[in-house]
């Protein structure tokens, strides 16, 4: 009888442990804080999730892998911490915050709930604005060398141009895209020797 009781108690104990871990995981999954599956180096987890969403809207998944699958946001975060000067990193982060704030003010939906198509439309609208008003890009180039506080328009222009350029560069140089989308065949024809 004691053996039967021990097995019963063991079953109840393991069920309780299993159920509590599932409940904890479910509650943790309900948190409102956006998450990424990599550890950010130069950004907060919230900024990393925002960057990942922006990168995915620039290179969305279609028949080819998207920016998220290629690890573009992770690469950009690491590049910011290693390759950029501190003030450029500051411009990038502050520009991203201005971009997200303007998105929240001017769009019907908040940035965190927006689809990649909605974010893509906003980024495209920025480039249409830059095409119509080249002075904005000229102000960006001339403002980079100047010291002092930068305007929100400067920061946002810096961020949008840098994130699009860096996303495409990181996407096309990633291992996943290099092997699956653009595989290199050194000899495209069949070679028959003498």
How would you name each of these model-derived features?
Residues 1-5, 21-57:
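C-terminal segment of N-terminal export signals and the immediately downstream linker at the start
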Residues 1-17:
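N-terminal secretory signal peptides and thylakoid transit peptides that target proteins
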Residues 30, 63, 192-194:
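Functionally engaged cysteine thiol sites
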Residues 38-42, 60-67, 83-87:
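A short N-terminal beta->alpha junction/helix N-cap motif
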Residues 44-48, 67, 154-159:
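Structural motif
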Residues 47-78:
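Post-signal-peptide N-terminal segment of Sec-exported extracytoplasmic proteins
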Residues 53, 71-194:
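Mature-region segments of soluble proteins
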